[in-house]
Design a protein with these regions (language model features):
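Gly/Ser/Thr-rich phosphate-binding loop
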Residues: 2-5, 15-84, 96
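Structural motif
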Residues: 7-9, 35, 215-217
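Alpha-helix capping/helix-boundary segments
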Residues: 9-11, 38, 122
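AMP-dependent adenylate-forming
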Residues: 54-57, 72-269
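Acidic donor-binding helix in nucleotide-sugar-dependent glycosyltransferases
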Residues: 12, 23, 183
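Ser/Thr-centric signal marking residues that sit
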Residues: 2, 7, 62-65, 133, ...
Length: 269
């Protein structure tokens, strides 16, 4: 085995089943991660398991023929602001990236907005969905772009950072909260790469609270909440922390928040 490609959350699953011991994969030469944010904790575990492998962090949606930005994982970490995951780097040849506001104005480095992509690799649109195509593939400054639905920021070095999905940004008791920001601290204080936060319960379409999940059934919920209290404001602290043997993944191999909410609904019933 000389080449590896997967979503980062698969590494967390390998750790859970004790399949990621130091020097477990010495033959690996190239490791590519994509499809979701790459936590630095995953990088550390992978470096120990595959010490001879180069690591690449790729980003890109299906609508842009998948990967269109990349970042080599170097000895010096390049982490996103207020996050524990790696930069997605710069556009590949033939691709362009920018951060835009809701009015589709280009934003300067340091400003948070939606990540937009352009280039020859863009899809023509969605089959039999003209309205959706026009909304997601607008013309900006005379050029066709794709709006990814991802929050992003460009730093002073020109690198892009994906800060999570816009639809994972919720409003709870008047506060705007990014669930991925909680997840970052949850991974750090639990020491577990498999961690996620959901808004639950939902009443009349409005979030009423937060519940966190960690991929370890023996997790000490009280200790985790205490540690979160030391690094997060009160309105971002989950009301409960639940441990599972493993967290559900969707067809893309990403943690499935919808399935976690459905699990909570079943418990409530």
């Amino acid at each position: 085995l000389s080449v590896w490609f997967s979503v980062p959350s698969l590494v967390g699953m390998l750790k859970q089943v004790k399949a990621l011991s130091p020097d477990a994969m010495p033959s690996l030469r190239v490791s590519v991660f994509g499809g979701e944010p790459l936590p630095d904790s995953v990088v550390a575990a992978w470096r120990a398991a595959a010490p001879n492998s180069r690591i690449e962090n790729f980003y890109g949606p299906t609508e842009a023929t998948v990967f269109c930005l990349r970042r080599a994982v170097t000895a010096v970490a390049k982490l996103s602001p207020e996050r524990d995951f790696w930069s997605i780097g710069r556009p590949m040849p033939g691709s362009e990236a920018a951060v835009v506001d809701q009015a589709l104005n280009f934003l300067a480095p340091g400003s948070t907005g939606e990540l937009a992509l352009a280039g020859v690799q863009l899809a023509d649109g969605y089959l039999d969905a003209t309205e959706l195509t026009s909304r997601r593939f607008p013309e900006i400054a005379g050029q066709r772009w794709y709006l990814t639905g991802d929050l992003a920021i460009q730093d002073a070095d020109g690198e892009f950072h994906c800060l999570g999905r816009i639809d994972n940004q919720i409003k709870l008791h008047g506060y705007r909260i990014e669930l991925e920001e909680i997840d970052t601290h949850l991974r750090q204080v639990s020491g577990n790469a498999m961690a996620a936060t959901v808004a639950w319960p939902i009443a009349d379409g409005i979030p009423q609270g937060l519940v966190a999940f960690v991929g370890d059934r023996s997790v000490d919920a009280g200790a985790i909440i205490a540690r979160l209290n030391a690094v997060l404001p009160a309105y971002m602290i989950p009301g409960r922390v639940l441990g599972l043997d493993s967290l559900p993944l969707n067809s893309s191999g990403k943690i499935d928040r919808k399935a976690l909410c459905q699990l909570l609904d079943q418990f409530k019933a």
